[in-house]
Every structure is written in C-alpha cells, then in structure tokens.
C-alpha cells in the first residue's frame, strides 16, 4: 500500500506501508496489515491505516497487477534506472512469462543496465522483485520508483487533453471512489508537479520495529514513533527513501 498526500505547501508525499506490519483486524483477530484489503476491501484498509498512523484517509485507488500492465502500456511504457542485478532478474522473468503477458507478445531481453525503457510487463515485474538482497524493502522502493516514472511520463506530454483522454481510457482498469471531477483535478495537478520533488518515505522506519519470526513472520512496530516520524515527513519532507 502507498499513501499519496499533499501538504499545505503543495508538496507531494509518497509513503509505503509495508505489508508485514502486525495489526488488529476487526472481526479477524491479528494479522498483517495488507490482509485488511482481503477482509474488507479498500474501506477497511483505509480505516486500519488511518487508525494506526493518525491519518484521515477517505479516498482510494486500487489497481491489480494485470491492470497496471495495461495502464503502463497505454502510456507507451516508462523509463527507469535499473541495476545489473535487476536487469538479469527482469530478463529471467520476461523469458518465463512472455507467453502469459497481457498482449501475448515476446519481450526482447534488456541489453544493458542503467536507464532503460520498459513495457508494462517489464515494469510490473521490476516492482515485484524481492530477490536482489533488498527483500520487501527494495520492492517497496521500486514501487515508488515506478510511480515517479509514470508521473514523469505524464509531465513530459504537457497536454491536459491528452491526460484527460488517458484517464478516461484507463478508468476501466481502476477501482476508486474518486468521482470524475476529482479525477480530472488530480490529472491536471499531475501536470504541474515535478516528479523529482516528490518526497518518499517508508513505514515502519528504520529502528522502529523488530522482526517476529515465531510462527507468522511479521513486524512488531513502534506505532507512536512511526506516527511522529510520519507527521514530520508529511509536513517537512524529512524522510528517507533508502531500500535497506
């Protein structure tokens, strides 16, 4: 899960909520925070995240893996910086899944690391990678990296009509409680935002949790400390986008 917000200064913040945070799930006992969506959809997920991190979240956008592939392809792909290890992982994945891709296409292997252009299948596989030594920490960082890349792609067009057309065409792949007017406002706002200025953070922050591997592997989180750090980040942007 990612919380996207804008503070009073108009600065955009992106906060990953790691899936292994252990919480109370009303009516379902205790479990990982990502189970909230399974048990109660977006409404329960918003309620749980709001309660534990002292936020007021009432709007959501949900996109599954296949839909994200379609959305990225609709935009014409994205440009991302990848490491050599990430390149090797991607080539292995696309070779294995090319017959299962949404378009049925054969995806050519990436020939170099660094800045590369990725289609939807490649970009989504990149965000799912947990095998580069960074585990789930790296995965959440790549998710934020992809959202920034999408924002950059949108901003390069500098065309409100194109963006509104993309929003209408992509609507079928998205579940949201945003109304059309709100979607339009956010789309136009995206044209004015500098993706490089988007602040990124991860919850739980380093040093604020312990790993419990007795039974169901999860994070025992210092919620008060994380609420404090999150408030500071959302207000002043003092956070970290480290992958460790």
Each PLM stretch: what is its role?
Residues 36-102, 179:
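Amphipathic, coiled-coil-like alpha-helical scaffolding segments used for oligomerization/assembly
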Residues 175-244:
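C-terminal solvent-exposed extensions
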Residues 1-38, 137, 219, 223-232, ...:
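Extracytoplasmic strand-loop-helix segments at the start of, or within, the mature domains
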Residues 73-161:
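Flexible, polar/acidic helix-loop-strand segments at domain edges
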Residues 30, 42-50, 65-69, 73-75, ...:
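Extracytoplasmic/secreted envelope proteins and their assembly/folding machinery
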Residues 1-5, 13-18, 32-34, 48, ...:
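Soluble periplasmic/extracytoplasmic beta-strand elements of cell-envelope proteins
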Residues 31-39, 54-59, 130-138, 151-157, ...:
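Second-shell loop/turn segments in exported
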Residues 6-9, 17-22, 38, 65-68, ...:
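Solvent-exposed coil/turn segments that connect beta secondary-structure elements
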């Amino acid at each position: 899960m990612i919380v996207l917000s804008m503070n009073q200064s108009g600065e955009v913040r992106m906060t990953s909520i790691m899936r292994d945070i252990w919480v109370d799930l009303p009516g379902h006992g205790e479990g990982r925070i990502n189970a909230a969506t399974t048990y109660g959809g977006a409404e329960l997920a918003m309620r749980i995240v709001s309660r534990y991190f002292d936020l007021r979240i009432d709007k959501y956008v949900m996109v599954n893996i296949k839909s994200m592939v379609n959305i990225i392809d609709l935009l014409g792909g994205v440009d991302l910086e990848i490491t050599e290890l990430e390149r090797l992982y991607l080539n292995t994945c696309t070779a294995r899944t090319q017959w299962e891709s949404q378009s049925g296409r054969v995806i050519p292997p990436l020939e170099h690391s660094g800045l590369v252009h990725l289609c939807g299948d490649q970009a989504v596989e990149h965000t799912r990678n947990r095998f580069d030594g960074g585990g789930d920490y790296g995965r959440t960082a790549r998710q934020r990296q992809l959202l920034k890349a999408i924002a950059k792609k949108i901003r390069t067009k500098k065309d409100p009509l194109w963006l509104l057309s993309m929003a209408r065409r992509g609507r079928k792949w998205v579940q949201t409680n945003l109304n059309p007017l709100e979607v339009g406002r956010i789309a136009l706002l995206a044209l004015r935002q500098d993706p490089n200025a988007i602040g990124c953070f991860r919850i739980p922050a380093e040093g604020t949790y312990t790993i419990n591997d007795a039974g169901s592997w999860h994070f025992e989180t210092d919620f008060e400390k994380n609420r404090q750090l999150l408030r500071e980040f959302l207000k002043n942007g003092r956070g970290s986008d480290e992958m460790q």
